[in-house]
Amino acid sequence: MKKVLFLFLLVISFFRGFLNASSLYERIINKETISVGTEGIYPPFTYHNKEGKLTGYDVEVARELAKELGVKIKFHETSWDIMLTGLKSGRFDMVANQVSLTTKKRQAAFDKSLPYSYSGTIMLVRKDENRIKDIKDIKGLRAANTLSSTYGEIAFKYDAQIVSVDSMAQALLLVAQKRADLTLNSSLAILNYLNTHKNSPFKIAWESKEKDGGASFVINKHQEKALELINQAVQRLINKGVLKRLGEQFFGKDVSQP
């Protein structure tokens, strides 16, 4: 009897907590704290500086968004492969990590804000690699990419063998060690890497002619009122020149326009 009563009270407690949990919209309206998922190992978008502080273009845009909304912000660092799962489970309210929502499955589960940056795709290979002149040439070759990323999807589309990695840094290491033949990533990330590593063993083998659909803040579906407030805040950041300033800080140019 005591066991049954305990289980009953446990269930009641769970549902009471569930019902009392505020929505993202309510937290914004009440000027509370919003939580943001990000990698923390993907420069120049999300990384730790020499002082150990979490920073990067996406991180600083998220901080400016919080200021614009009048809320506090808390970051949760997690690997890309489980980031959207963490969002779906409610571990955090949104994701700021160069997300474009390119697949129908993701589009069915999540919504994205107005874009805050645009980028193309670059393929990086070793300087002694001469087999690749076009994206179609990667068929059968080893692509070091995160399985669930946009770039992993591109490599899979063109029949490359995916060598699973957790980060761009790991991908570059595998290519340098000849354990992979290539890696695909954001043109902004690749150009930043090459600019800060003048003597790297890599070269650009291919670059997309078009930019992506834009990176955005991503939230769970069915939060239209919260999304509207976020979109309004992003638009104000654009209008005030905040995104332009951050783009110039991290990339030397405005990346908020297609």
Please name every model-derived segment.
Residues 32-55:
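Short glycine-rich His-centered loop
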Residues 85, 99-107, 154-157, 172, ...:
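A ligand-binding cleft/hinge motif common to bilobed small-molecule-binding domains
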Residues 60-68, 136, 142, 147-150, ...:
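Extended ligand-binding regions for polar small-molecule ligands
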Residues 34-35, 71-72, 88-97, 177-185, ...:
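Alpha-to-beta junction loops
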Residues 22-23, 150-163, 201-206, 232-258:
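Ligand-binding clefts/hinges and TM-proximal coupling segments of bilobed small-molecule sensing domains
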Residues 40, 117-124, 187, 191-235, ...:
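Periplasmic-binding protein-like
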Residues 75-85, 130, 148, 163-177, ...:
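Short helix-initiation/N-cap motifs at beta->coil->alpha
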Residues 59, 63, 67, 72-137, ...:
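Acidic, polar ligand-binding/catalytic clefts
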